[in-house]
């Protein structure tokens, strides 16, 4: 087991799909899921070459053989540089991620990893197309004997400074940052996110790199198009998010509240279920929602980002159903997917039954 794999940091007894590890080159190519390259057979390598399956998304974490073996608990993990040379020789590309575990692969080890990876960012078809640096995510369900510690504010600021120094160097050499920090670093460090231009064409958006800045950009563009001066009848709504985005989303709430007759309150929650002080929205569970909202004045309803729910079903990560949460809170809940749906729901309040109908059509 990889000690920092989120799948291995879950409680037992939940739905089967939560424990599925998709270390599969086909899923990596099709959906952008990350694989380690440690489990591929010779036939699979041949298939990748023959069918030119590229780009792949690869969890690197470290390029020093012993350190990567220690991190991935796999004796073949030390071959990563050989694998990259193999891909480079065939003009096949990857997007890389490095999950930083304090006191293990940070500091000089992180610098070594990033410089090694960037050495493959050369030529017309660079083997390493982009790199994401991500903080390790820990839950209270992980084994207590592991060697992992959470990322502190001080550590986040240290990594930001280290990576930004390298980015400056790479911009001069390549005309691109090449590597990017996941949004969580800035949230943990409590510093401002980089501007929109920093993320170029968002090559690592699926890894949480620039997703907040992109959401803010899309919100402002859509709000300009859709928000009226006033609405009737007036309504008051609660918008639930993970507390990781609380500061970044305050200007969006102010913009919504400029509409006469519309009042939106942002409620930012952490997850006691996972045992996290800082939580991204997608990891909030039914238990977290109930604990955070019970006893509050929820007005005319709750705006709930649908990424908290299983795709195609109104079920949270802890297997509590949305209907259960509605029944206990005794208030309408409006699952919203994306910026446009969020704003339109504020203006029209599509009922939960419409959401269930939509689920049934998928």
Each model region followed by its residue ranges:
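Conserved Radical SAM active-site core
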Residues: 1-124, 137-166
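Structural preference for beta-strand elements that scaffold enzyme active sites
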Residues: 55-57, 93-97, 130-132, 178-180, ...
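Auxiliary Fe-S-binding modules of radical SAM enzymes
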Residues: 120-125, 132, 138-362
């Amino acid at each position: 087991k990889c000690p920092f794999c989120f799948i291995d940091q879950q409680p037992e007894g939940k739905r089967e799909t939560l424990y599925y590890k998709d270390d599969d080159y086909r899923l990596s190519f099709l959906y952008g899921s990350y694989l380690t390259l440690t489990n591929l057979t010779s036939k699979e390598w041949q298939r990748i070459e023959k069918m030119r399956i590229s780009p792949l998304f690869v969890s690197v974490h470290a390029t020093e053989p012993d350190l990567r073996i220690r991190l991935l608990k796999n004796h073949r993990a030390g071959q990563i540089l050989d694998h990259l040379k193999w891909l480079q020789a065939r003009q096949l590309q990857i997007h890389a991620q490095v999950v930083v575990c304090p006191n293990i692969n940070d500091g000089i080890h992180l610098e070594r990893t990033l410089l090694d990876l960037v050495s493959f960012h050369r030529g017309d078809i660079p083997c390493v197309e982009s790199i994401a640096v991500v903080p390790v995510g820990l839950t209270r369900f992980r084994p207590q004997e592991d060697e992992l510690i959470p990322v502190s504010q001080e550590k986040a600021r240290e990594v930001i400074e280290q990576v930004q120094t390298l980015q400056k160097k790479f911009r001069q050499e390549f005309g691109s940052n090449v590597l990017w920090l996941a949004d969580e670093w800035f949230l943990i460090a409590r510093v401002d996110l980089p501007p929109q231009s920093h993320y170029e064409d968002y090559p690592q958006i699926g890894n949480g790199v620039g997703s907040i800045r992109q959401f803010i950009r899309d919100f402002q563009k859509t709000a300009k198009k859709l928000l009226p001066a006033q609405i009737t009848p007036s309504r008051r709504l609660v918008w639930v998010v993970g507390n990781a985005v609380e500061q970044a989303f305050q200007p969006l709430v102010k913009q919504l509240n400029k509409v006469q007759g519309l009042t939106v309150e942002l409620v930012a929650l952490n997850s006691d279920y996972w045992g996290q002080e800082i939580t991204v929205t997608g990891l909030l569970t039914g238990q977290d929602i109930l604990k955070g909202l019970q006893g509050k004045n929820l007005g005319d309803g709750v705006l709930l980002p649908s990424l908290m729910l299983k795709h195609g079903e109104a079920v949270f990560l802890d297997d509590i159903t949305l209907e259960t949460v509605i029944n206990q809170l005794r208030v309408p809940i409006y699952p919203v997917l994306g910026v446009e749906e969020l704003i339109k729901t504020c203006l029209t309040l599509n009922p939960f039954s419409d959401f269930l109908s939509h689920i049934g059509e998928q």
